[in-house]
Amino acid sequence: MKKRNRAAMLVLAVSMVTTPIALLHPLSSYAYDGKSSLEPIQLPADIVHLLTELKEDYVPLMKDLHVDSYGGTSKSGYVINLSDRKSVITTNTTLNISTNAEGDMTQFVLHDVNRDKTTKINKKEAYQKAVDFIRNYIAVDHVISPQATLSLDRASELDHLAVVSVYPQLNNTWVDKETARVMVDSKGQVVGFQQDKVKLPTPAEVADPSKAVPLEKAMKEWQDKVSMELVYDESAGKLVYLPEQLPTIDALSGEEVQSVYKTTSETMKIKGTADMGVWRDTKKMEQMLEKDFGLKLNQRTYKNVKEDKKYKNSDIDRHEWNASSYQSAWITLDRKSKAPIEFKLDGPVEKELEKPLTHDEAKDIAVQFVEKYLLSKEQSFSVKETSLVENLPGWADQNLVRPISSFAFHPEIDGIPTKRPLFYMEVDAKKGNVVLVQVNDLPSMPATITKDGIVKDEKAKDAYVKEANLRLAYWYPKVGTHSAKLPQLAYLPTADAKSLQIDAATGAVEETWLEWKASH
């Protein structure tokens, strides 16, 4: 938030009407909570300026909003809540803004149930809008991602949004740890902003960037290790080559950093017997949770957010069974079709397994879930499996690392997998069961795919490595959500390098959307 004079106060009138009114530029301000009389809302002048700026430059939808409530001080920071609410129960759009004691905006969340999720996002324009927002409202020294990524997170209602991330610097070197992000919708409107305080080590605690090996040496090692995979790009309807593995290079030694994960791929024909009606019936979902996951539902509080007015016109339903001490369950469904979007168990179990599952046992459990609850026909998949290596590095706290095996089920056509998986699953070896399921909405696939006339993978790799670049960074090694306390100096592929793919028919290098995922 730009620094302004906070001494001036502007009193905005409060009206107990049930339709929006234009009292003072830029926004009408009234509170509706069912009471017969309310005191005037007083907003500091800099908050009024902030709201004016946002409406004029970034959020045109604010012209239809009014201030519902406001609190805080210049010493503690402010919280401002706006909406288009015309009565206690009718709300389509809400906007929540928070600032800190320094006067900087820390959070901005626009929730519009009628947001357009079909119009194609203009990647360049969305990026420029986000960059302009960042330069106006983030005062600290930072590095802006060179391109926007695409959020597809339906479970959090963050799908179909362009995301531009912000990173800190240390020793004039990029730190690969997101400190802020801006989200832009298909209309070029800013709908989300989050800024977090990231504690960085002192310059003396990390490696000196001047000690890094030359970029050319790192590039040679990296290029030798890169491999390409032929996949079917379901959104473009064609075959492409993607970088299958993007290694990290230790900047002090010039050698590849060994991964903490083992990855394999297996073709599997799965005979699904799922009765998809389970997702349409709350009682059947509860039977599943009790029988297959051992949840004691009489010890949990059920909530259907469909009944929450915030989600009144949403395109999702979320069923929650919340527990204060042990695992909570959340099931997110498409509101119209009742198809599952996400299944999640979070929190400790009452008793973990004395002997953790092996990776093969975890795979069996994942496949059984697909057969029983997600797939109602026979289908071939390329299953990409990830598990932890046996001997984790010293920075990994064994008490904090969860033994997670993940499985991405990519539909396979004539031996070629799709670019995105249909199902993604995680199994916790100590809990002994599935803890996360995500279902993607993929377009219809062709019955057959021919590889006739496509370029060879060697040619595709040559084309890719000629365009891909590395950058020096402080990189935090991670295992799941657990990361090292101190970053490692490393050469990482740039965002541009990660977004490249090769058209298998022509050998041309193409830029595509990278998918954004929350880091925690």
Predicted regions and their residues:
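Long, terminal "pre-/pro-" and other extracytoplasmic accessory regions
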Residues: 2-520
